[in-house]
């Protein structure tokens, strides 16, 4: 996790954000609570620079396994209410990675988040990595199942700064990092590509070239 001082502002976009809601039967008012949201991109089959991914970004209402970067040595809890309120801020945010896969580098943006969902205690995300621009990512992640994720925040509010475990009651997501799972503050995070791995795709393309010559 990484905390930033500035707040990322959303801009106007022709892309549509699609919320998914469920009815709270226990609520006397029958209120609707958002638990998922997605940005609908036009489908482009075989796009050379869009490689779908999915992952578990963090856990909600659960203390982190270790202190994240910027938390001054404190483990943290992101409340479900805070995560739900901040869900729209994840859409359109970048995913990044750091050489060594052990932290954050917000300047090394390699993909985009297009959907986010609260599934029980898991906050899951999906989107695209820019596989043509960053071929090393597909080569690395297409053959490794040990990857996780870590969120980046701005304007995080802590309920009690004196507490041993900080409870985050409000925040804005500004991005996420792909990193080794054992380097993430939460061990239960995950990251995986949802497409044919790079080596297999290269083999298929090479076979097609041989057939055409």
Q: Which stretches of residues belong to each language-model region?
A:
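Polar/acidic, low-complexity leader/linker segments enriched in S/T/G and N/D
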Residues: 1-88, 201-211
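A broad, low-specificity signal marking well-ordered, structured residues that form hydrophobic/aromatic
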Residues: 51-55, 93-95, 123, 149, ...
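Short beta-strand and beta-hairpin "edge-sheet" elements
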Residues: 19-41, 100-121, 159, 164-181
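Generic structural motif
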Residues: 44, 56-65, 81, 98-100, ...
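Short low-complexity stretches enriched in small and charged residues
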Residues: 74-85, 101-110, 130-135
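Short conserved beta-strand and strand-loop elements enriched in small hydrophobics
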Residues: 89-103, 149-151
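Residue microenvironments linked to proteolytic maturation
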Residues: 114-206
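A glycine-biased structural micro-motif
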Residues: 73, 86-96, 120
């Amino acid at each position: 996790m990484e905390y930033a001082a500035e707040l990322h502002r959303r801009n106007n976009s022709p892309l549509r954000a699609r919320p998914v809601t469920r009815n709270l039967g226990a609520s006397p008012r029958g209120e609707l609570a958002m638990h998922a949201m997605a940005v609908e991109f036009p489908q482009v089959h075989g796009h050379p620079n869009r490689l779908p991914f999915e992952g578990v970004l963090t856990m909600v209402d659960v203390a982190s396994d270790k202190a994240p970067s910027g938390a001054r040595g404190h483990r943290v809890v992101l409340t479900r209410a805070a995560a739900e309120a901040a869900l729209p801020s994840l859409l359109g945010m970048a995913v990044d990675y750091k050489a060594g896969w052990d932290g954050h580098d917000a300047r090394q943006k390699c993909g985009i988040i297009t959907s986010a969902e609260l599934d029980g205690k898991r906050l899951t995300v999906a989107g695209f990595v820019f596989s043509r621009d960053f071929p090393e990512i597909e080569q690395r992640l297409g053959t490794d199942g040990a990857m996780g994720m870590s969120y980046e925040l701005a304007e995080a509010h802590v309920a009690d700064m004196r507490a041993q475990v900080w409870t985050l009651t409000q925040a804005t997501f500004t991005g996420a990092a792909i990193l080794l799972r054992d380097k993430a503050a939460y061990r239960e995070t995950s990251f995986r590509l949802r497409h044919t791995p790079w080596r297999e795709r290269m083999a298929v393309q090479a076979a097609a070239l041989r057939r055409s010559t």
